[in-house]
Design a protein with these regions (language model features):
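Short amphipathic alpha-helical interaction segments
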Residues: 79-96, 246-257
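Short acidic DE-rich linear segments
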Residues: 286-291
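Glycine-centered, phosphate/nucleic-acid-interacting loop/turn motifs that mediate DNA/RNA or nucleotide
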Residues: 97, 108, 262
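Short helix-coil junctions and helix-kink-helix linkers
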Residues: 69-81, 237-248
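Phosphate-/nucleic-acid-contacting segments
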Residues: 234, 246-249, 253-256, 266-281
Length: 291
């Protein structure tokens, strides 16, 4: 079962999709979205995933910023909690994001009806500055989108919006989200709410697909002869923390959640104390090397 939560339909309505293989490709997530979600705005990947999922089910997306927010924020009684971040995530997804060397990070992945002009924006951030925390990157993006707030008058948050998903260059790399994975995250959100977890479902989603992204990238480097074969199916502790911008305690908590969902395995490094490797659970994850 998968969920859909348009504004005018009561929340928690479930749609039964018959004859669906849980390991079929459900959504393709560009590498750039995963990296930008860790370094620019932690809601980029969850927002894109929400839009792609509903597009695949219904053929179109009619939603609102509040609808997206309600799927991922634990504090249900705070109506506008983190709404600005989801608004900014939509702005970023419509835009073309480049780094200081003009390398493309994201290329206009969505279009918003009546706001198509936003897709012409080119936002540049300097990755050589403020590398310590993701909030520093978010602050840069906040400054970049301020000038557009007056023009749009936050109307993206006030009413339903129709969003189209643009195709992206698969040559830049992507990972897959299956029905099975998506349902695991959707169901686990209820557990996090009941247990008042300090870890958000957004952090868990970002961390999991970052692990998939690193492993997929390793496979590509091995095929090019640029990496050792023994590193293809695992991610080191240091690389995981660096890519996710996590402190030690946060990394441990997130990994514990992903382990409890049976999405990953954590293996101690026999050569180094307090070190570990992260591997995907083979029972849930199919190899992507053939895709």
């Amino acid at each position: 079962m998968l969920w859909y939560n348009p504004v005018k339909i009561k929340k928690e309505i479930f749609i039964i999709l018959k004859n669906t293989d849980g390991n079929n490709v459900f959504a393709k997530i560009p590498f750039g979205v995963i990296q930008a979600s860790n370094k620019i705005n932690q809601y980029l990947l969850p927002t894109y995933l929400y839009l792609a999922v509903n597009k695949n089910i219904f053929g179109e997306v009619k939603t609102s910023v509040r609808s997206i927010r309600e799927e991922y924020i634990n504090t249900a009684n705070r109506t506008y909690w983190h709404e600005d971040e989801f608004y900014e995530a939509l702005i970023v997804l419509t835009s073309n994001i480049i780094d200081e060397e003009n390398n493309s990070i994201i290329d206009n992945l969505i279009d918003i009806k009546n706001f198509e002009h936003l897709s012409q924006m080119e936002l540049q951030y300097n990755s050589s500055k403020n590398l310590n925390t993701s909030s520093d990157f978010e602050a840069q993006i906040k400054n970049l989108v301020k000038e557009f707030d007056a023009e749009t008058d936050y109307s993206l948050k006030k009413k339903d919006i129709i969003i189209s998903i643009n195709s992206f260059q698969t040559g830049k790399g992507f990972v897959k989200c299956s029905y099975q994975e998506y349902n695991l995250f959707r169901n686990f959100q209820s557990f996090l709410k009941k247990n008042n977890s300090r870890i958000s479902i957004c952090q868990a989603i970002n961390a999991y697909y970052t692990v998939k992204f690193i492993i997929k990238r390793n496979e590509a480097l091995i095929n090019l002869g640029l990496a050792k074969k023994n590193c293809s199916d695992q991610v080191s502790k240091s690389l995981f923390k660096k890519e996710c911008c996590f402190a030690d305690n946060t990394a441990k908590c997130v990994l514990q959640i992903l382990k409890s969902m049976n999405l990953i395995e954590v293996v101690n490094n026999p050569k180094k104390e307090n070190d570990y490797y992260i591997r995907l659970n083979k029972n849930i994850n199919e190899s992507e090397t053939q895709q």
